Amino acid sequence: MKSSTQTILEHTAIPRHIAVIMDGNGRWAKKRFLPRIMGHKRGLDALENMVKHCAKLGVQYLTVFAFSTENWRRPEDEVSFLMGLFLQALQKQVRRLHENNMRLKILGSRERFNRQILQGIEEAEALTANNTGLTLSIAADYGGRWDILQAANKLIAEGVSEITEDTLAKHLMLGDAPEPDLFIRTGGETRISNFLLWQMAYAELYFTDILWPDFDETALDAAVASFQKRERRFGRTSEQLPIGQQRN
């Protein structure tokens, strides 16, 4: 059986694909006696800085968890603000991405988004579709279980007689991208919260107490430095790895 793990980069100075849960916006605001929405605003600034630094480092794919299927349970005013911030980012930031030859993709179900947001998504993806630089994928109304289920349902609808790792992987939201090499979660929590459950099977996990609005270039460099020290064996022994990939 052909395994999807062949898309993972086994050893490199810089991870080809970084996935991030941007956690801690609300706590960042609370510590400063500010409304939670101010934390989300600063979180957007942190994302802009991370995109720039990832491109500078040579990262090819950056996938961030912006809004999960479970986040609809948050207070109505916060959800409304997040949707407005999402639309604002689509309208204002996509031009900057396009000017820097970056591609934008939105992952997740779009059934609950209003017409204005749907139009913003379509226009942003179309504008940047042919760019060849860093690909920024934003997971919004996304869940890892939902992703696997929708991929399986697509295959059933196509009448596929046998589902393999390879065929399923190609129907996932990140089906055209290599699997993440490095997963970062800020804010002190040590779980993956239903994010990219299939795709992160072999990702290196990095957890930090830094709240997302404070996650800067230095913090990203520290995460990458940790990644560079890892020995990625994928079931093999250390002795089976090429000399340059063995950990001292």
UniProtKB/Swiss-Prot annotation:
Residues bound to Mg(2+) are 23, 204
The UniProt function text for this chain reads: Catalyzes the condensation of isopentenyl diphosphate (IPP) with allylic pyrophosphates generating different type of terpenoids.
Q: Which residues form the active site?
A: 23, 71
One annotated Gene Ontology cellular component of this protein: cytosol
Q: Which NCBIfam families match?
A: PRK14830.1, uppS
Cross-referenced PROSITE patterns: UPP_SYNTHASE
The record's keywords, sorted A to Z, are: Magnesium, Metal-binding, Transferase
Annotated binding of substrate, by residue: 24-28, 36, 40, 68-70, 72, 74, 185, 191-193
HAMAP family given in the database record: ISPT
What remark does the entry make about the cofactor?
Binds 2 magnesium ions per subunit.
Q: Which GO terms describe its molecular function?
A: ditrans,polycis-undecaprenyl-diphosphate synthase [(2E,6E)-farnesyl-diphosphate specific] activity; magnesium ion binding
Q: Give the required cofactors.
A: Mg(2+)
What quaternary arrangement does the UniProt entry report? Homodimer.
Q: Give the protein family.
A: Belongs to the UPP synthase family.
Q: Point out the signal peptide segment.
A: none
Q: Recorded E.C. number(s)? A: 2.5.1.-
Q: Is the keyword Cell division in the record?
A: no
Per its record, how is this protein called by name?
Isoprenyl transferase
The record's Gene Ontology biological-process terms are: polyprenol biosynthetic process
Gene name, per UniProt, is: uppS
What is the originating organism of this protein? Neisseria gonorrhoeae (strain ATCC 700825 / FA 1090)
Pfam assignment, any one: Prenyltransf
Q: Which InterPro entries does the record associate with it?
A: UPP_synth-like, UPP_synth-like_CS, UPP_synth-like_sf
Keyword field contains Transcription regulation: no
